[in-house]
Amino acid sequence: MPKGGQKMLDLEQFTGSEQNFITSLGIDIEVITEGVKYLIENTDIKQALNVIFASIQANPTMQDEGFLVIRLIQEPKRIFVKIEDGNDNILDSFPLDKIELPKEQLDLWYVNNTLLLPSEY
């Protein structure tokens, strides 16, 4: 079992993207992939994604980016979020209440209004 009681999820099973979903999961994202749908259904990440996407929607620079890296880092008492442009330039960063992530660092990519796991690109 991963450190800190993290729930083990097999996210590596999602490669390529065979099916996309218009989100009906209560988050402000237009399209998600199978891997992200699985992640949302099997973890408590939904509320964190709502906060992250509120930040993106409030920032015109991030809205204009065609590619964003959303990095969630598990810390002892919180999650730390970094939103980058894909070239290690941090566009925003902030702490969130602790949730259990499937691993100590979870990266998600937001590409042309679609949220996906890096392995699904």
Task: State the predicted function of each range.
Residues 82-121:
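Short, compact, well-ordered microdomains
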Residues 2-92:
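N-terminal "domain-start" segment
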